[in-house]
Amino acid sequence: MLSRMRPLQKWTQAAIFILTAVSITTATTSTRQLNLVDLVGQSQLILHGTVKSVTDGIDSRGIPYTEVTIRVAEALRGDINGEYTFRQFGLLKPRAMGNGTVNLMVTPAGWATYTKGEETILFLYKRAAWTGLQTTVGLGQGKFKVQMAGAMNQMSNAGLFQNVAIDSSLLGSREQRALLTQKGAVNVNAFVSLVRQAVQGKWIEAGRMRHAQ
């Protein structure tokens, strides 16, 4: 407990919380609207699957986290089979610490949230070197809930296809229709097909999918 920690331990934990809080605040306040080029271009992993479990805890360094396990149906980017587990910053809800204090460091507003059993598509950054935490690209923008044959991120897909230029010769009719979506759910099969082709064909690297402006 904090009341029994040595001064050095207290300072170490305080430093961890300060550094983590600063990085979280910076990420939250600086998030801009991202489109498909950004999501694909900045992701290390792109996973389509079902949320198996969502738990939370506090690691040995005192960093609060939410742990998510995905049953992976398809890894659109990355060599992942079966299940994938990652942790992002923040608790699911405030937690009593048993020493008269309450840890209020919950998942920040605008970050991806998860529900057991939901089908989802995730665009994930690489794990942070220091904390091991991992978040979706653009926070809530990089997590899509699949429902009723549609896929939609936590920003209702606003700006997802804005300023996206793709060589027309690469697109089938359903992908072309998907690109017309300005807001709201996009057909999940068309969206997954589009992302799969972009990754496998290295469209961004070849300049065949790019920012229009």
PLM features per residue range, with description:
Residues 2, 8, 13-213:
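Transition segments tied to proteolytic processing and entry into folded domains
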